[in-house]
């Protein structure tokens, strides 16, 4: 069974990342590698995590012309990762190209999910980029586009999970960032929830980064989260 907890390795150096990884159990959590760490350490770091038998979510949010995104997704799959993502706003053709690029992997292909609306966005900010929808409307619209393209699910705030599940089906995966512990500040995330709240809303996987990586004892935080989940 795949763990619900995805620990975001939000570090700016390899030593700190490895120190935490060595304390984690691949049976208890998956790991997320984002743009910062991937740019710093590259594919070999991802492969090293896979060799440790961790499920790796490669969070690079591909968004480009369809051919480029398809090739990027194929390259990501070559690393043996469990999950990759693209920006849903890239459109139906881009999403379909990403999906098609993974067909050769059959049942061993990574999960392909689409980013809807970043959890740093606040209500009203979409207008600044020319979108008149509300946050829930836009997230739901993009989730339905991802489902039409044949993707496995989406990244979305927990606030939109219920409506996405209603529109796209209970088996449509929802991966939820913006998870904060009750005593944490929101920092640059606007639409946040606690782990327990997100699970109640129906989130399938919770991405938790800074509450873990910035803690004085990250492993204690992980252990407490696992007990709660």
Curated annotation (Swiss-Prot):
GO cellular component entries: cytosol
A biological process term (GO) from this entry: 'de novo' UMP biosynthetic process
Transmembrane segments: none
Matching Pfam families: OMPdecase
Top-tier EC class: lyase
EC number assigned by the record: 4.1.1.23
Pathway: Pyrimidine metabolism; UMP biosynthesis via de novo pathway; UMP from orotate: step 2/2
SUPFAM superfamilies recorded: Ribulose-phoshate binding barrel
InterPro entries registered for this protein in UniProt: Aldolase_TIM (IPR013785), OMPdecase (IPR014732), OMPdecase_AS (IPR018089), OMPdecase_bac (IPR047596), OMPdeCOase_dom (IPR001754), RibuloseP-bd_barrel (IPR011060)
One annotated GO molecular function: orotidine-5'-phosphate decarboxylase activity
Reaction it catalyzes: orotidine 5'-phosphate + H(+) = UMP + CO2
Residues binding substrate, per UniProt: 10, 32, 59-68, 119, 180, 189, 209-210
Swiss-Prot/TrEMBL keywords: Decarboxylase, Lyase, Pyrimidine biosynthesis
Residues at the active site: 61 (proton donor)
Similarity section: Belongs to the OMP decarboxylase family. Type 1 subfamily.
NCBIfam families, per the entry: PRK00230.1, pyrF
Record function comment: Catalyzes the decarboxylation of orotidine 5'-monophosphate (OMP) to uridine 5'-monophosphate (UMP).
PANTHER family attached to this UniProt entry: OROTIDINE 5'-PHOSPHATE DECARBOXYLASE
Subunit structure: Homodimer.
Name of the protein described by the UniProt record: Orotidine 5'-phosphate decarboxylase
Species assigned in the record: Legionella pneumophila subsp. pneumophila (strain Philadelphia 1 / ATCC 33152 / DSM 7513)
